Amino acid sequence: MQQDPSISSKQKSTAVIKMVISMVIFGSIGFFSEHTNLPSFELVFVRCLCATLFLGFCWLASGQYKTEKWSKRDVLQTLACGFFLVFNWVFLFKSFEETSVTIAISVYHLAPVLVLLLGSFFYREKLNVISVSSIIICFLGTALISGINGSTSLTQLMGSGIIWAVLAALFYAFTTLLGKGIHNLSPYTTTFLQTGLGVIILIPFIHFGAFADLSQGNWIMVVSTGIIHTGIVYLLFFDSLRFLSTKFISIIVFLDPAVAIVLDTVFTGFRPDLYQTLGIVMIFAGMALTLVRRQGKANVTAEGTDIEQIQ
């Protein structure tokens, strides 16, 4: 990502603040989701609905719809990304239901490594020693976190929440790879189309009775995940991208999981054991290694950049 030389220091400072705020908000979504008292499908449905309405209003109010360059290929690819994105959210929130936010978020951040692995398969991208090392380190870290051993059954694995976090990471990786081919539509439009698709495809799975017993506090958390964690945060995120260097973004994205882990340990009292702690460190060390390969490069997708992980 090349910075415009005409960017002023004030613009850059403002962009840094926006990016930091967006990463902090992204990092708090696990904490918010645990206080919604909604299952994953219903929570993602509300998130998609609120985000679609909010981003649609901003898109129309700003007049940006007048400058969009529509193409059938981009729209179809955006919708395909939207399918994977929506179920990425479903699986992520499902993992929050079954395990701690710390464990779920750590495993979820396998996504950049999975992009490397899948990219080598689908796009014939060569893996160097650093890439292979990062993949091995991350998967060993995942094994330590999940406590997998010779006696671990499929039922135990499914009930641990780890499998849902892995599926969320896998679907995010597919979202990233598909998003590389979207060139003409703006990030606001792609996100609007994807969340709108989410509303449509999730309706058959929604149990509306789940909303009947929500308290006022639950509703505040529910609406926040849609408007703040999806709508407002994307405005902050995308508005700051073009003013910041790839190197800075590569570093600041670690603020997202850091906030999630701090909130989980402070407010829920979760304490990972020695092996889980080692696994968490290994996953983020492996993720950091992937940045060595991609330093100086950034491809903006419907959800962010290929060097970055957001919820």
UniProtKB/Swiss-Prot annotation:
Q: Which residues form the signal peptide?
A: none
Its transmembrane ranges are: 13-33, 41-61, 76-96, 103-123, 128-148, 157-177, 192-212, 218-238, 248-268, 272-292
In its keyword annotation, does this UniProt entry include Transmembrane helix? yes
Can you list the GO cellular component terms from the UniProt entry?
membrane; plasma membrane
UniProt-annotated location(s): Cell membrane
| Topology class, membrane | Multi-pass membrane protein
Is the RNA-binding keyword given for this protein?
no
Give the coiled coil ranges: none
- Which residues belong to any copy of the EamA domain? 24-147, 166-292
Instruction: Give the top-rank taxon of the lineage listed in the UniProt record for this protein.
Output: Bacteria
Give UniProt keywords alphabetically.
Answer: Cell membrane, Membrane, Repeat, Transmembrane, Transmembrane helix, Transport
Into which family does the record put it?
Belongs to the EamA transporter family.
Q: What is this protein called?
A: Uncharacterized transporter YxxF
Which gene name belongs to this protein?
A: yxxF
